[in-house]
From Swiss-Prot:
Record flagged with keyword DNA-binding: yes
Protein role: Necessary for efficient RNA polymerase transcription elongation past template-encoded arresting sites. The arresting sites in DNA have the property of trapping a certain fraction of elongating RNA polymerases that pass through, resulting in locked ternary complexes. Cleavage of the nascent transcript by cleavage factors such as GreA or GreB allows the resumption of elongation from the new 3'terminus. GreA releases sequences of 2 to 3 nucleotides.
An annotated GO BP: regulation of DNA-templated transcription elongation
GO molecular function annotations of the record: DNA binding; RNA polymerase binding
Species lineage: Bacteria, Bacillati, Bacillota, Bacilli, Lactobacillales
Protein's name in the database: Transcription elongation factor GreA 1
Organism: Lactiplantibacillus plantarum (strain ATCC BAA-793 / NCIMB 8826 / WCFS1) (Lactobacillus plantarum)
Coiled coil: 43-74
Ranges annotated as spanning the membrane: none
HAMAP family: GreA_GreB
NCBIfam families noted in UniProt: greA, PRK00226.1-4
Length: 156
């Protein structure tokens, strides 16, 4: 079976690398806390030991997950054209209320609505992919379809 690659921007890849480094720096302290809790004696009723073991397990699990993300990462460089793809910024106008908003189309690991980053696999991301300025696009969202107009497309 072919592995599925995770498309992402270079910035998203570097953010994962940074999180891995941060977690690796936290690991020795978590191990020290676990060892200190284990030294307190009976582990069957040692809440500090159980908590420290759980914390270290979460850290190790997150590291494995992030390393897999990098292992199967495919960094996408935005094409030098007017079509919307990963890494580019798009300004859209919602045709029902004429509100405008600018998003960056990113890989699914990078999506963050608070930062106006939408995944290329989201309903709106899929609908906008490969469209250009002045295109009217129908977005098939879980709560119903709506239309948006592409106002601008810019490279990052």
């Amino acid at each position: 079976m072919e592995p599925t690659f995770n498309k992402m921007t270079a910035a998203g890849y570097h953010a994962i690398e940074q999180e891995i480094e941060d977690l690796k720096q936290q690991r020795p302290e978590r191990i020290r806390i676990l060892a200190a809790a284990a030294a307190l004696g009976d582990r069957s009723e040692n809440a500090e030991y159980s908590s420290a073991k759980r914390d270290l397990g979460r850290l190790e699990s997150r590291l494995r997950y992030l390393n897999k993300q990098l292992q199967y990462a495919q960094i996408v460089q935005p094409a030098d054209n007017d079509q919307l793809d990963i890494g580019k910024f798009v300004t859209i106008e919602f045709l029902d209320d004429h509100d405008q908003i600018t998003y960056q189309l990113v890989g699914k690991q990078e999506a963050n609505l608070e930062q106006q980053k939408i995944s290329f696999t989201s309903p709106i991301g899929q609908a906008l992919a490969n469209h250009t300025v002045d295109d009217v696009v129908t977005v098939n969202a879980p709560n119903g379809a709506y239309q948006v107009k592409v106002i601008a497309v810019k490279r990052a």
